[in-house]
């Protein structure tokens, strides 16, 4: 089985994020092996692959959410602005200020719609006045294409919104603190088709200002929204455990129409497994 990776996408500009010879462990278990990739700025990059291949694990490494797991450790580097985000003197809270996350299930805070957006802005000291806070809240909700639906009920609970609206509220909350990168871990997995379309349209709008990395099991979704796609696979070892690795990373059209690797072709054509 293929264990090397094919990076046919080449970029000359400075990437938004890059992984260099990255391996991830939980205790003695190796979850990901030797990942190297450069994520371009202001593009949508999709991670696809079977369950258990490490897509979400890698995504969470990009803003150090895996630090919350005691047995997690990492070899290699993740570079943001040419600095390894895992250097000992780097504050993970500051990293998360610049690299935001939207999770699979909508998770609004138990607060009003207004305070869902304002919370991170307050914590980071990004608004100097009530007027400035109001502007940030409105701008963020407009960016999430939610303003017209909620502008007359900003004092209501975020839980009063529909599932699709809640997810757009979470996206608005993520962009309110003006991150460079927004990570999305299957953001449409729990949404109905109509809400999914709205979130995909939103992602297409947000790429103008943000770098977006999205994990998705929906390959049609990847073809609709992603500029680039990375295909990950998993290999079983003697213990029966499986480690993930990057098979191929290229422009989305190439991955789906002219992949270099047979494993990629088998997966995107439905012959996988």
Swiss-Prot record:
InterPro entries according to UniProt: AAA+_ATPase, ABC_transporter-like_ATP-bd, ABC_transporter-like_CS, P-loop_NTPase, PstB-like
Residues engaged in binding ATP: 49-56
One Pfam family cited in the UniProt record for this chain: ABC_tran
Bilayer topology annotation: Peripheral membrane protein
Name this protein carries in UniProt: Phosphate import ATP-binding protein PstB
EC number: 7.3.2.1
SUPFAM superfamilies named among the record's database cross-references: P-loop containing nucleoside triphosphate hydrolases
GO biological process, one term: phosphate ion transmembrane transport
Source organism superkingdom: Bacteria
PROSITE patterns: ABC_TRANSPORTER_1, ABC_TRANSPORTER_2, PSTB
Species of provenance: Trichodesmium erythraeum (strain IMS101)
Gene (UniProt): pstB
Family recorded in the similarity comment: Belongs to the ABC transporter superfamily. Phosphate importer (TC 3.A.1.7) family.
UniProt keywords, alphabetically: ATP-binding, Cell inner membrane, Cell membrane, Membrane, Nucleotide-binding, Phosphate transport, Translocase, Transport
Tagged with keyword Zinc: no
Reaction(s) catalysed by this chain's protein: phosphate(out) + ATP + H2O = ADP + 2 phosphate(in) + H(+)
Enzyme class, broadest EC rank: translocase
Annotated Gene Ontology cellular component terms: plasma membrane
Quaternary data: The complex is composed of two ATP-binding proteins (PstB), two transmembrane proteins (PstC and PstA) and a solute-binding protein (PstS).
Annotated compartments: Cell inner membrane
Domain ABC transporter, first and last residues per copy: 17-259
Function: Part of the ABC transporter complex PstSACB involved in phosphate import. Responsible for energy coupling to the transport system.
GO molecular function: ATP binding; ATP hydrolysis activity; ATPase-coupled phosphate ion transmembrane transporter activity
